[in-house]
Amino acid sequence: MKSYEIALIGNPNVGKSTIFNALTGENVYIGNWPGVTVEKKEGEFEYNGEKFKVVDLPGVYSLTANSIDEIIARDYIINEKPDLVVNIVDATALERNLYLTLQLMEMGANLLLALNKMDLAKSLGIEIDVDKLEKILGVKVVPLSAAKKMGIEDLKKAISIAVKDKKTAEIKYPNFEPYIKKITSILQKDEDLKKYNLRYLAIKLLENDKYVEEIVKNSKVWNELKPVLDSIINELSKKYGEAELGIVEERYKVIDKIVKEVMKKTSGKLTTTEMLDDVLTDEKIGTLLIIPFLWMLFKFTFDVSKPFSAMIEYFFGFLSEVVKSSISNKFIASLLADGIISGVGAVLVFFPILAFLFFAISFLEDSGYMARIPFITDRIMNKFGLPGKAVISMVMGFGCNVPAIMATRTIEDEKDRILTILINPLLSCSARLPIYALFAGALFSKYQGVVILSMYALGVVLALITAFLFRKLIFKTSPSYLIVELPPYHIPHLNVVLKNTWERVYDFLRKAGTIIVFGVILVWVLSVYGPSGYLGEEVFENPQLIANSWVAVIGKTLAPLFSPMGWDWRACSALVFGIIAKEVVVGSLAMLYGTGEENLSSVIAHAFSPVSAYAFMAFSLIYLPCIATLAVIKQEIGWKWALFAVTYEMILAYVVALVISVIGNLLF
């Protein structure tokens, strides 16, 4: 079977992931790009007896290689030379999207344009002459609406034709053609350079691109080219200030001409998006509205998920009893029932909460509102010393700190990036939610949503204060500002929301099936063994026995340090195991208190006071990041900063928990 490799590329929020999923279905492979931890998604599909491998490149606005994502996209297209590059273009923002298109054409890529969101463009009064656009660019243009699955078959057909009918389209830049021609006439004298598109090399040399400059410096023609290039750049610098700015200006002149020829906007009235943004992005009103929006999100999550959690809780309690009564070998029965089933069950009981939370977040994302939160809060972030782009990473931190830290790669300034990474673990990821849900349900049942929301708010407040102090004491420079795309509002597409929800829930389940199982088994082993050897599986029913275990030794060693908070050795031990993954804390508590998930809430209600429980939640929010987060911090900014993060978070967690305990006990 003949096979081809194609790449999908486009600006962020153009529907690239939706098109990738529509093309590949479930045939998706997720890994990392070589040398970095940026996620690499690959998939495949078959059409007319041919196989197509699809590579989903990171979302980028340009290929100027100022960020890791841009470098990955550029290097892949230049070095891997895919059979076809499918450029996803947002029909509602044609002018902005065509900038990347022109850069791809400059590279000499075999190009196909997928003009997405045509239905939305039509509703906004935007008309695009697809045939004329195709003629001007010299590449095939396929109109579609991926969210409604319209045009996907047309896209597959166009791909199957374009991979065979390879051609390089070229856009002329009138004011720069003489310079480009002069440079390429020298470059073509070196046969080794002909593996690259010479026009692309010439344009990038005019832009002072260091990557291309290094390629040409090692060529046979560099000595001849250097004085010619310097002369041209000096001439352009006098005219434009910088030669690079001249190229950018020329691209936008071409884009402006194209847009005027192919696009008409028939509606002159205010759009729904413009009317909503007058209110929702207002500096004062918009900021105030964020709080009730987030409160409703949490209210929805817990009210709807409660009966589903109760059913899972009952199932795992029943399963644990069945295993104990069915397996004669008490060691194996205890490992399965008290270890794996009890521990994992205590975590999975929060699966509905996470599912509905992710659903609500995906709903807000697809509606277009979530993108406004960074925009609305940008000025506030700058007052606390954070760069504008940090807001995007912070919002992602509410899902998982690992991808949130990776997202800081779009921050160009190194000090800004390090600062953003250091404060990100203070933002409450979804893995901490089971801890909050357990304690809030056990001791604050009437105010469960408010208590949990307060944990998220506490994390944000601490992150902002920490950022302000670090900016003053360590990173003594001004933060950069945010440039972010605000997509139009629209009614969320259920299939897109469900797809995003499932991907996030699946990540949680995958983690629950690996790290959590390992964690609870480790806790079980340390519980049934002690300094004197094997204690027996009865430890979970006999508090006297488990008090002699290794896990008790660990907890009792730490207990005096945490006695002001009112926590016993079991609580201290659970926090230690939470370093593996925060989800492990709940499973550890279930085993250490010798109960299944069905009775854990009542046990917690007796073991903790409201004040000590709230302090425990706060400590869980702030203290050491999980192993995965610590590993990615080390990879991104090194061991020095990773150890710094561990140290300051432990100190901060202890101080905050102590303050809550002291003040709480004085007041209540």
Curated annotation (Swiss-Prot):
Domain of life: Archaea
Database matches in InterPro entries: Fe2_transport_prot-B, Fe2_transport_prot_B_C, FeoB_Cyto, FeoB_GTPase, G_FEOB_dom, Gate_dom, GTP-bd, P-loop_NTPase
Positions annotated to bind GTP 2: G35, V36, T37, V38, E39
Segments traversing the membrane: 344-364, 386-406, 418-438, 450-470, 515-535, 574-594, 613-633, 643-663
Residues bound to Mg(2+) 2: N21, T24, G25
Membrane topology: Multi-pass membrane protein
Binding site for Mg(2+) 1: N21, A22, T24
Binding residues for GTP 1: G10, N11, P12, N13, V14, G15, K16, S17
PROSITE patterns attached to this UniProt entry: G_FEOB
Residue stretches making up the FeoB-type G domain: 3-165
Subcellular location: Cell membrane
Residues where GTP 3 binds: D56, L57, P58, G59
Binding site for GTP 5: S145, A146, A147
Keywords of the record: Cell membrane, GTP-binding, Ion transport, Iron, Iron transport, Magnesium, Membrane, Metal-binding, Nucleotide-binding, Transmembrane, Transmembrane helix, Transport
Binding site for GTP 4: N116, K117, M118, D119
One GO MF term: ferrous iron transmembrane transporter activity
Any GO CC annotation of this UniProt entry: plasma membrane
Entry function: Probable transporter of a GTP-driven Fe(2+) uptake system, might be able to transport Fe(2+) into or out of the cell.
Protein family per UniProt: Belongs to the TRAFAC class TrmE-Era-EngA-EngB-Septin-like GTPase superfamily. FeoB GTPase (TC 9.A.8) family.
Subunit structure: The crystallized N-terminal domain is a homodimer.
Notes concerning its domains: The G protein domain (about resides 1-184) binds GDP faster and with higher affinity than GTP and releases GTP much faster than GDP. Release of bound nucleotide causes a rearrangement of GTP-binding domain G5, which may transmit information about the nucleotide-bound state from the G-domain to the transmembrane region of FeoB and effect Fe(2+) transport.
Official protein name in the record: Fe(2+) transporter FeoB
Organism listed in the record: Methanocaldococcus jannaschii (strain ATCC 43067 / DSM 2661 / JAL-1 / JCM 10045 / NBRC 100440)
